[in-house]
Swiss-Prot record:
The keyword Secreted does not apply. Keywords: Cytoplasm, Elongation factor, GTP-binding, Hydrolase, Magnesium, Metal-binding, Nucleotide-binding, Protein biosynthesis. PROSITE patterns: G_TR_1, G_TR_2. Residues 136-139 are annotated as: G4. Mg(2+) binds at T26. Its EC number is 3.6.5.3. This is Elongation factor Tu. Monomer. It comes from Burkholderia cepacia (Pseudomonas cepacia).
Length: 396
C-alpha cells in the first residue's frame, strides 16, 4: 500500500494506552490502527511491530516506547504504547511522550489490578488530564452482572484519584476480535465507539503558540550601545517588540521590556514557540539575568521552592546510583537549563528509595524556580543524572 501524504488539516492530539500487564494494551493499539486504517486511511500496525518497541533516550533514561499514528473523522492522533510496566513509569514521569489523554485498558475478566491502580495514580500525579476506559476481553465474560461490577470498580478507582469516574466514557469490547476483523458489537464497532470517545471526550489541546509567553534563559550577553540580550528557545506563546515581560526565578521577580527580537542575526518583530531567539531587554544589566531564570508574560508564572513530586530513580544498569538514598538526601534538581540544590523528604512509610523505584517525595529547593504543576526535572549528582521527576503539587 502506498504511503499517504501527511496532511496537517486535522487537529493533532497525543494519546497512549495505560493499564495492567496482559490486559491487552498492545493488542488494542494494533486493533485501533487496523480498524481506523480501513475507515480513514493510514497505515495499520501488526501486534509484533508494536511490541518490538525501539529504545529511546529521554533525559538520559532509556525507555522502550512504540509510536503509532492514526486518523479519525475529526483528528490525527499520535499514540504511544510501552511494552513493560517500568517503561510506563519512566515515560509518564519524564514526559517523553506527553499525553493529552490516556486510554486505560482493563480486562473485564480480571477487573482492576495493581498496575491499573498505579497507572491511574501516575496519570493523576504527572497531569494526564483525561482518561477513557476500554473494558477489554468482554467476549470472555458471559455474565452481564459481572461486567457491570467491573465497570463500577473501575469508576470508583478513577474517582478515588480525582478523575470524574461517573462521567468517564467506558467502551466495552474485545481488541482481539476487532483485530481479527469481527464486525460485531465487541469487535470493530467497539473500536469505532472508542474513536468517537477520543474525539468527543478529549478536548483539542492548546497549541504551544497560544500559551502565555515563556522562554528559559540559556545565555546572557551584553552588546555595547544596545543593552542586554538573552538567548533561548521560546517554549510557548509569542513575544512582541515593545511588550512588558518578567524575569522569574532564582532572584526576586523583575519587570522589563522587550526592545528587540533577533533570529539568525535578523531582526524580527516577534518570536514564537519553537523559535531560538535573542531577546533584547531595556534597562536590564547583564548581571540581573542568569541561566535558569525564565522570561515570561507578567503574572503567568511564579517562583517556588517547596513542592511534591513523583520521581523515578535510575537503576544501576541505567547509570544511576548503586545504593539507596534516605530522608533528607540533597541532590541537585535540574530545571530547564540549570541545577538547584534541594533536600528530599520521603513519605512516612518509606525508609529509603532503591535504584529503579518510583516514589512520591516532597522537595525544598535552596533557590526559587519558575514553576507550575506538570513541570519536568532531572535529579543529578555531580552532573550525572540519577533520576527524573515531575512537579505534582506546589506547596508554598
Amino acid at each position: 500500500m502506498a504511503k499517504g501524504k501527511f496532511e496537517r488539516t486535522k487537529p493533532h492530539v497525543n494519546v497512549g494506552t495505560i493499564g495492567h500487564v496482559d490486559h491487552g494494551k498492545t493488542t488494542l493499539t494494533a486493533a485501533i490502527t487496523t480498524v481506523l486504517t480501513k475507515k480513514f486511511g493510514g497505515e495499520a500496525k501488526a501486534y509484533d511491530q508494536i511490541d518490538a518497541a525501539p529504545e529511546e533516550k529521554a533525559r538520559g533514561i532509556t525507555i522502550n516506547t512504540a509510536h503509532v499514528e492514526y486518523e479519525t473523522a475529526n483528528r490525527h492522533y499520535a499514540h504511544v504504547d510501552c511494552p513493560g510496566h517500568a517503561d510506563y513509569v519512566k515515560n509518564m514521569i519524564t514526559g517523553a511522550a506527553q499525553m493529552d489523554g490516556a486510554i486505560l485498558v482493563c480486562s473485564a475478566a480480571d477487573g482492576p489490578m495493581p498496575q491499573t491502580r498505579e497507572h491511574i495514580l501516575l496519570a493523576r500525579q504527572v497531569g494526564v488530564p483525561y482518561i477513557i476506559v476500554f473494558l477489554n476481553k468482554c467476549d470472555s465474560v458471559d455474565d452481564a452482572e459481572l461486567l457491570e461490577l467491573v465497570e463500577m470498580e473501575v469508576r470508583e478507582l478513577l474517582s478515588k484519584y480525582d478523575f470524574p469516574g461517573d462521567d468517564t466514557p467506558i467502551v466495552k469490547g474485545s481488541a482481539k476480535l476487532a483485530l481479527e476483523g469481527d464486525t460485531g458489537e465487541l469487535g470493530e464497532v467497539a473500536i469505532m465507539s472508542l474513536a468517537d470517545a477520543l474525539d468527543t471526550y478529549i478536548p483539542t489541546p492548546e497549541r504551544a503558540v497560544d500559551g502565555a509567553f515563556l522562554m528559559p534563559v540559556e545565555d546572557v550577553f551584553s552588546i555595547s550601545g544596545r543593552g542586554t540580550v538573552v538567548t533561548g528557545r521560546v517554549e510557548r506563546g509569542i513575544v512582541k517588540v515593545g511588550e512588558e515581560i518578567e524575569i522569574v526565578g532564582i532572584k526576586p521577580t523583575v519587570k522589563t521590556t522587550c526592545t528587540g527580537v533577533e533570529m539568525f542575526r535578523k531582526l524580527l518583530d516577534q518570536g514564537q514557540a519553537g523559535d531560538n531567539v535573542g531577546i533584547l531587554l531595556r534597562g536590564t544589566k547583564r548581571e540581573d539575568v542568569e541561566r535558569g531564570q525564565v522570561l515570561a508574560k507578567p503574572g503567568s508564572i511564579t517562583p517556588h521552592t517547596h513542592f511534591t513530586a513523583e520521581v523515578y530513580v535510575l537503576s544501576k544498569d541505567e547509570g544511576g546510583r548503586h545504593t539507596p538514598f534516605f530522608n533528607n538526601y540533597r541532590p541537585q534538581f535540574y530545571f530547564r537549563t540549570t541545577d538547584v540544590t534541594g533536600s528530599i523528604e520521603l513519605p512516612k512509610d518509606k525508609e529509603m528509595v532503591m535504584p529503579g523505584d518510583n516514589v512520591s517525595i516532597t522537595v525544598k529547593l535552596i533557590a526559587p524556580i519558575a514553576m507550575e504543576e506538570g513541570l519536568r526535572f532531572a535529579i543529578r549528582e555531580g552532573g550525572r543524572t540519577v533520576g527524573a521527576g515531575v512537579v505534582a503539587k506546589i506547596l508554598d
